[in-house]
């Protein structure tokens, strides 16, 4: 059985359509003071239940929704509850940098999900793989790579070079470059403060080439747009970005529209706003089939890793 909150209903509908089933019957609403109200409208006793809800903006509302949904299902005697969180919010707060007096919020969220009654977590392209270790329950972190790679293959780009937007993304970019039999370039940037970045240097040959920037998410798009400009300044023929999660906060969409970026390709782990849908440089791919197949395999106790064996 698959239930969903209000964060990304379209994706949930696409997933159940792929599986040729119907969404579970659940009422999710708000009391007059804004508190979340959830009621399960069918029998779930002993059932294998999946709750599909990304914790995207409004992050705290969507996070509270999934907590209350899980609690309602647990109290209704669901047999096993899997929190399917395509985009895992708070994942960027996964450590204490330089002993700063800050929370490790990713761990807080992991604790909350387990206390609420989640038995297993399914997510996609976690910002930091080590977050899986914050849980004492199984975590399946699947990858949008096959979706994004398939789109690149279909477009039959020539003279490709895969670009890592920073040093931390080199492993992801190198894996893509290997699959595409393409060269690798790296952008060395310095980030003076949160959500502000400055492109400093490009390592690799990009002159006259089609550049593919691969990242797990695009937030304010400051890094992405500066990277595209730096690549064009170095003679790149075209710059395309492939990012799993379209967070697109602040003035990201306007920034992308006026940037040197030729196109941004994202998945639907997070729904695009009307402004995002209207942006001619943003294109969205569906991850419903991949999520649906993963849910089916988890429910049938089959291998998930074999989906990504190649």
Swiss-Prot record:
Mg(2+) 2 binds at residue 166. GO terms for molecular function: ATP binding; kinase activity; magnesium ion binding; ribose phosphate diphosphokinase activity. The active site is at 189. The keyword Transferase applies. Its main location: cytoplasm. Homohexamer. Involved in the biosynthesis of the central metabolite phospho-alpha-D-ribosyl-1-pyrophosphate (PRPP) via the transfer of pyrophosphoryl group from ATP to 1-hydroxyl of ribose-5-phosphate (Rib-5-P). PROSITE patterns: PRPP_SYNTHASE (PS00114). Belongs to the ribose-phosphate pyrophosphokinase family. Class I subfamily. This is Ribose-phosphate pyrophosphokinase. NCBIfam families: PRK01259.1, ribP_PPkin. CDD domains: PRTases_typeI. One of its GO terms (biological process) is purine nucleotide biosynthetic process. Pathway: Metabolic intermediate biosynthesis; 5-phospho-alpha-D-ribose 1-diphosphate biosynthesis; 5-phospho-alpha-D-ribose 1-diphosphate from D-ribose 5-phosphate (route I): step 1/1. Its cofactor is Mg(2+). SMART domains: Pribosyltran_N. Binds 2 Mg(2+) ions per subunit. Mg(2+) 1 binds at residue 127. The keyword Cytoplasm applies. ATP binds at residues 33-35, 92-93. It is an enzyme of class 2 (transferase). It is found in: Cytoplasm. GO terms for cellular component: cytoplasm; ribose phosphate diphosphokinase complex. Keywords: ATP-binding, Cytoplasm, Kinase, Magnesium, Metal-binding, Nucleotide biosynthesis, Nucleotide-binding, Transferase.
């Amino acid at each position: 059985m698959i239930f969903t909150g209000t964060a990304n209903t379209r994706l949930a509908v696409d997933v159940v359509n792929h599986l040729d089933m119907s969404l579970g019957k659940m009422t999710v609403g708000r009391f007059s003071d804004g508190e979340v109200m959830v009621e399960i409208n069918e029998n779930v006793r002993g059932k294998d239940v999946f709750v599909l809800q990304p914790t995207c903006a409004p992050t705290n509302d969507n996070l509270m929704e999934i907590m209350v949904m899980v609690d309602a299902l647990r109290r209704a005697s669901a047999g096993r509850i899997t929190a399917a969180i395509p985009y895992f919010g708070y994942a960027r707060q996964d450590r204490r940098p330089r002993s700063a007096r800050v929370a490790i919020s990713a761990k807080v969220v992991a604790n909350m999900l387990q206390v609420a009654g989640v038995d297993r977590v399914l997510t996609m392209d976690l910002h930091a793989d080590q977050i899986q270790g914050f849980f004492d329950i199984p975590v399946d972190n699947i990858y949008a790579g096959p979706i994004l790679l398939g789109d690149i293959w279909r477009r039959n780009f020539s003279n490709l070079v895969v670009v890592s937007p920073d040093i931390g993304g080199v492993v992801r970019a190198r894996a893509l470059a290997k699959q595409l039999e393409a060269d690798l370039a790296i952008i060395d940037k310095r980030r003076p403060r949160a959500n502000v970045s400055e492109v400093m240097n490009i390592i690799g040959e990009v002159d006259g080439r089609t550049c593919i920037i691969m990242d797990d998410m695009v937030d304010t798009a400051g890094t992405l747009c500066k990277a595209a400009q730096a690549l064009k300044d170095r003679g790149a023929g075209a710059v395309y970005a492939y990012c799993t999660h379209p967070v697109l906060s602040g003035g990201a969409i306007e920034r992308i529209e006026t940037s040197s970026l030729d196109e941004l390709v994202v998945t639907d782990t997070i729904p695009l706003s009307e402004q995002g849908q209207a942006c001619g440089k943003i294109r969205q791919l569906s991850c419903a089939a991949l999520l649906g197949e993963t849910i089916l395999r988890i429910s049938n106790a089959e291998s998930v890793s074999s989906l990504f064996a190649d």
